[in-house]
Amino acid sequence: MANREEKRNLETIPVGSLGIISLPGCKPLGEKVDQYLVKWRAERESEHKESLAFAGYQRDSYLLDAKVPRFGSGEAKGQILESVRGTDLYLLVDVLNYSMTYSLCGNENHMSPDDHYQDLKRIIAAVGGKARRITVIMPFLYESRQHKRSSRESLDCALALQELVSMGVDNIITFDAHDPRVQNAIPLHGFETVQPAYQFIKGLLRNVKDLQLDSNHMMVISPDEGGMGRAIYVANVLGLDMGMFYKRRDYTRIVNGRNPIVAHEFLGTSVEGKDMIIIDDMISSGESMLEVAAALKERKANKIFVFSTFGLFTNGLDKFDKAYENDIIDKVLTTNLIYQTPELLQREWYINCDMSKYIAYIIDTLNHDSSISDLLNPNERIQNIVAKYKKGEL
């Protein structure tokens, strides 16, 4: 893929000088993305390199200096400390990084998704319309779980998208949106939801040996009806069968803002003796995921691997530790698109899937105004890595 990107990108002129602003909660990911871009562009040879259109194409870093200082009252302002006039600007933001804190009237306050979203708007406001183009890369889409209205509820995700577009954002790139149809709120602007299926499969195959990738020995499971699309895609590219659970809820009661789940009912063929891949967009508390894994174990499933784009682990890691000790789960794979605690990274059952190279490819390609269709469809790359695994070359 790298060679294909090189060839395609060299055929087009960049939209503008590339600039990346990594908001405070997203610094480590932004630095990794920057390293890839610096390396690729330093090695890239082109007869047009000296032309004016390629001015500032090769630099030591594409990260621009920006900060969001706060007053003692907790109010903040966005500051960009270098010129962004004419740049093709990419803003990286992790709205789930609760490790970030600020002082509020002498008290330490942890940043909520609302705080991160406000900081993003402050930086866009600080740009002041000077950038050639603004693309927001928001891996976990802000308020994406509030994508539809039930009774008298606010449509926060749609409001946020419309607000960003009204501020001059041209494209919004997110990963594994809870419901991609939320883009209906901004039908005339760019919205891409990227799937990390290739990175999950690569992470699993590199860390777990002796897997038999066929429908007699492995199966893909969707833990609920909402995640069927992801499971169907992975099942199809790997040539596996798919099963699903649906949640039976008690609609007479509301607990913590939602109807409680009474039971997980399974639909699918026999799972006995097969390895399971459970795939979902996020692990919140993880209770549903562990209940599904336990239900599969009761049906005599073999190893259980969990793929989840966003590992929130809102109730801590203890339940996952216990499930691992009791042989209910074998591995949990999530991405580094959101904040990961040091404790999570040390867990024996955890595999981290690095997405920085993928983001760098997307930024590099978009900066040249090239199509990212190949990047959004990883089928060819998945087939290549599966073939290598079967030959024992991984």
Where are these regions (language model features)?
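PRPP-associated nucleotide enzymes
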Residues: 1-394
